[in-house]
């Protein structure tokens, strides 16, 4: 398969996600095929957090597309992928638009000729990863980082990089999300295994790392002090620190953050291609990307600033850990099994 722009590694994995909070209304056009003029039903499968969908995305997308009924199926990336896999086998794909975290999954869908190529009118403004033919665009960029509780540790005491998590002084006090359930955690495992070898995870296992179902459990246990440090998504920590004034702090590892440019794509089986294209255009618009940043993720556009409390997107991109997306796409089951055997088996 021909590698898309982001596979070249030069593509700037900027910013962020669709898990967006405040999905403000889109511009209405006279053209019935754009923004407010589209009609019919549209089904979106996504890994965006439920509270963001219910409290912000639904009402604001409804405002952007008043004549189109937008339905949402939400779940972790792996839950959504499992659902889609069954629908593909049954030749009954119910989703029109897909917005899940793991970029490598879109490579598999493209190989299976299941995506609808669409050159968005916002194409020139997207400086993050995208397929050359428009079959997918990064719509949100998440960053896997290390976090700690500022009330429990001083900055100079906290881990500085990924290898520090294997230091015996953190034994039994570290955690990470489950790559069997989380697309972003899966990417992190693949990236770190490539950079440091699977022996890295042997060391984490020996150091008593705990694998939690999701980020919520991790952040709560960081707050209580059960965990001293943990691998977690940046947006979770930024949200708590800025909206609830919690003492959680972000560490941008000196050996590189793990950028996850999560895409948006249209299935070529959609019965509402005009509505799906309008949805893609809106998410990639400046308004849509500003909403992404309100969800504490980074934008895929160069004219939208990073979320409050974060580091300039360009700096994170320049120092990121290299990810072999094609390898992740081709070896999903093997990578997960290797992790399970080395870390999760007793």
Indicate residue ranges for each PLM-predicted region.
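Extracytoplasmic ligand-binding site segments that recognize negatively charged/polar headgroups
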Residues: 43-55, 73, 77-78, 93-227
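Conserved N-terminal structural module of periplasmic/extracytoplasmic solute-binding proteins
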Residues: 26-97
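Short, low-complexity disordered leader/linker segments with a strong preference
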Residues: 1-41, 346
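A bilobed periplasmic-binding-protein/Venus flytrap-type ligand-binding module shared by bacterial periplasmic
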Residues: 147-152, 190, 260-272, 282-283, ...
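A ligand-binding cleft/hinge motif common to bilobed small-molecule-binding domains
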Residues: 104-108, 228-247
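Short beta-strand->loop
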Residues: 116-122, 135-138, 163, 246-258, ...
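Periplasmic-binding protein-like
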Residues: 142, 172-180, 203-204, 211-212, 246-268, 282-306, ...
């Amino acid at each position: 398969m021909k590698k898309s722009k982001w596979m070249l590694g030069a593509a700037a994995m900027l910013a962020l996600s669709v898990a967006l909070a405040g999905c403000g209304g889109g511009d209405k056009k006279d053209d019935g095929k754009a923004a407010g003029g589209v009609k019919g039903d549209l089904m979106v499968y996504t890994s965006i957090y439920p509270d963001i969908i219910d409290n912000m995305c639904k009402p604001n997308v409804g405002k952007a597309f008043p004549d189109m009924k937008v339905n949402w199926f939400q779940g972790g990336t792996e839950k959504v992928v499992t659902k889609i896999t069954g629908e593909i086998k049954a030749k009954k794909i119910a989703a029109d638009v897909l917005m899940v975290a793991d970029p490598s999954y879109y490579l598999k869908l493209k190989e299976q000729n299941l995506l609808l190529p669409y050159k968005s009118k916002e194409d020139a403004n997207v400086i993050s990863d995208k397929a050359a033919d428009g079959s997918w665009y990064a719509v949100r960029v998440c960053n896997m980082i290390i976090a700690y509780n500022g009330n429990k540790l001083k900055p100079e005491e906290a881990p500085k990089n990924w290898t520090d998590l294997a230091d015996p002084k953190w034994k039994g006090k570290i955690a990470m999300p489950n790559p069997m359930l989380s697309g972003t955690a899966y990417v992190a495992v693949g990236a770190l295994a490539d950079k440091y070898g699977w022996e890295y995870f042997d060391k984490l296992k020996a150091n008593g790392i705990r694998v939690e179902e999701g980020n919520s459990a991790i952040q709560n246990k960081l707050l209580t002090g059960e965990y001293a440090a943990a691998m977690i998504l940046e947006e979770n920590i930024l949200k708590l620190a800025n909206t609830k004034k919690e003492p959680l702090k972000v560490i941008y590892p000196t050996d590189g953050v793990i950028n996850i440019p999560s895409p948006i794509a249209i299935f070529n089986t959609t019965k509402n291609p005009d509505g799906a294209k309008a949805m893609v255009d809106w998410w990639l618009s400046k308004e849509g990307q500003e909403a992404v940043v309100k969800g504490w993720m980074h934008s895929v556009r160069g004219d939208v600033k990073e979320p409050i409390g974060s580091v300039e997107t360009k700096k994170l991109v320049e120092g990121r850990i290299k990810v072999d997306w094609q390898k992740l796409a081709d070896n999903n089951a093997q990578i997960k099994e290797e992790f399970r055997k080395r870390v999760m088996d007793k």
